Amino acid sequence: MAAEEEEVDSADTGERSGWLTGWLPTWCPTSTSHLKEAEEKMLKCVPCTYKKEPVHISNGNKIWTLKFSHNISNKTPLVLLHGFGGGLGLWALNFGDLCTNRPVYAFDLLGFGRSSRPRFDSDAEEVENQFVESIEEWRCALGLDKMILLGHNLGGFLAAAYSLKYPSRVNHLILVEPWGFPERPDLADQDRPIPVWIRALGAALTPFNPLAGLRIAGPFGLSLVQRLRPDFKRKYSSMFEDDTVTEYIYHCNVQTPSGETAFKNMTIPYGWAKRPMLQRIGKMHPDIPVSVIFGARSCIDGNSGTSIQSLRPHSYVKTIAILGAGHYVYADQPEEFNQKVKEICDTVD
């Protein structure tokens, strides 16, 4: 369904990402226009009207935003934060259900999707703060008082970080398969030690961004996504019969690697967080309810909910398992996921 209004074409400036110089512009078949078209294809089957706009924040940056049912004023808005390597388009299976009786906002995280892609700090704590402040500035710009904040993967980590710093703005925190909560286990404590060849490969790849391979692959990058992640096409098969989803993921991740570099600066080898959230979440305001949603078939450690409960023994913490779902819970079992999220939201108002 067409959007109600689009104020400008994109939060980006320039037809091509600035870092793609020399031979790379012809090597990587992408541009901000390609990403815009890919996003529009992702959203064309969303069964409700919405408004899309770039929200201006500090330093000339913009946060690309979708608003659903924003004219409903008596319900706390639900705000969706996507995960690493994603964008707001990946919520396409969820918008219709979630916005039936409350405002829903989704935006591309700073450095991802169609939001601005600035240079981030190299320090993990400062990177985290840059993300958190961009969310707070976005909230202020839209005039939202309080939010139900939902984050998947990296978005879950940032939603928790935001809730720690701005507790008065969060009525409920929903963590969906959150990244970055446990500490990296000591190799000596692991039942299955990491093979030497994997450690060697990890050391060799340390100077590079996580998705650099897609850009190095150039015109073969899209087929690489299709080969490595054929499951994404299946997840969205009820909405698209073609390669719409993989094209969107490809164009999201071959632009300037701004958020990707920021994520790398927040990690230590093998994807663990430099500043694990479980070390801090016990300091979260006790009145903030937390719901943790995970896929019963996910390969990610699903014990974060139990750990959070032990660290917040006098606060509301609930863990919800979605049967038949993996890490991408919202796409694997969208109807069940949407229902659980709506039930959580109904406890707020």
From Swiss-Prot:
The HXXXXD motif is essential for acyltransferase activity and may constitute the binding site for the phosphate moiety of the glycerol-3-phosphate. InterPro entries: AB_hydrolase_1, AB_hydrolase_fold. This is 1-acylglycerol-3-phosphate O-acyltransferase ABHD5. Pfam families: Abhydrolase_1. The modification Phosphoserine is found at S122. One of its GO terms (cellular component) is cytosol. A motif (HXXXXD motif) lies at residues 327-332. SUPFAM superfamilies: alpha/beta-Hydrolases (SSF53474). PANTHER family: 1-ACYLGLYCEROL-3-PHOSPHATE O-ACYLTRANSFERASE ABHD5, RE40534P-RELATED. Residues 77-184 form the AB hydrolase-1 domain. GO terms for biological process: cell differentiation; fatty acid metabolic process; lipid homeostasis; negative regulation of triglyceride storage; phosphatidic acid biosynthetic process; positive regulation of triglyceride catabolic process. It comes from Pongo abelii (Sumatran orangutan).
